[in-house]
Amino acid sequence: LTKPLRGVNVFSKLVAGPISHTAAAFCRWSASANADRTGHPRTPGFGNPTGGEYQVLPPLKPDSILRDRYRVLETVGQGGMGSIYRSEDLRLAGRFCALKEVQIDTNSSEDQQQQARDQFHREASVLARLDHPNLPKVSDFFNDGNRDFLVMDFVPGTDLRAKVEEAKSQGKFVPERQVLNWAAQLCDALIYLHSQQPPVLHRDIKPANIKLTPDGIIKLVDFGLVKLMVPDDARTVTILQGRGTALYTPLEQYGGDTGHTDPRSDSYSLGATLYHLLTNQPPAEAKSRFLQPAQLVPPRTLNPSLSLRTEQAVLWAMSMHPDDIAH
């Protein structure tokens, strides 16, 4: 394979084919063609995937106005690097947007803080050029004191974590066909991201970061952990970049800023996400699996109605080492 196949239409033809073309496997197979060509990922150290701690500023208060344009309505998410706010665009009547806050580590040196700001603006510029139906559109970015902001479309709907919890509370599973439909849309978004120059990695794919709109469209949200892969510079790290969520994080993403990731790392996280959607429970962490491989329970043990092909595809996407995937 010399270049990835692209598009939901291509995927829809392949999904009914052999095991290597089902949802998670197809996406990881495609991603392998865009993997970093500077060398194989090395074995990382077992660091904390959430990185170091620093003082987080309190959330902005409702009715705060930023850039004389955006009025904060409410906080809709909060993490270790800042908050996400539902906001009103005062220049465009009736438009609501999401403000993604990325705080500067004030414990770092002035030079490091300036480098972080410069990196934020370079990468935010790339994100603003992205245009895909399964990604929220980034329309603006700016700095306000020790806070940087991305302005994105506000995506209405329910995240897939809530959909899984709803099914679980009823003693049911989300239908396999439905999950594969979502997977097709996610694959299309990831192939688009990974095909950029340089490739854009999401690095925090999980059910809570995937929205299902009232129209049935999947949106991969929360660009706050994005990393750009710059050729010959594996150190390209940004204040935008986080470490991911341990349950969905591949082994190569551990080790702090020294962890080596490429598009196949996103595919692992997609596989782990599909595992959760299909079984009603997240998979064992990669670090635990490295020490005790049997900790990963086969999906069909938890949900016997799953097809063997889908189970094998999910497990393939969750291979412990990226090089285990055939190119």
Enumerate the predicted regions with their spans.
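C-terminal lobe helix-coil module of Hanks-type protein kinase domains
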Residues: 247-327
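AlphaC helix of the eukaryotic protein kinase fold
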Residues: 103-129
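Activation segment signature within eukaryotic-like protein kinase domains
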Residues: 182-183
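Protein kinase glycine-rich loop
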Residues: 73-80, 84
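Activation-segment/catalytic-loop signature of the eukaryotic protein kinase fold
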Residues: 141
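Protein kinase catalytic-loop region centered on the HRD/HxD motif
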Residues: 188-200
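Conserved short submotifs of the Hanks-type protein kinase catalytic core
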Residues: 145-159, 163
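Conserved N-lobe loop of protein kinases adjacent to the ATP-binding glycine-rich P-loop
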Residues: 88-97
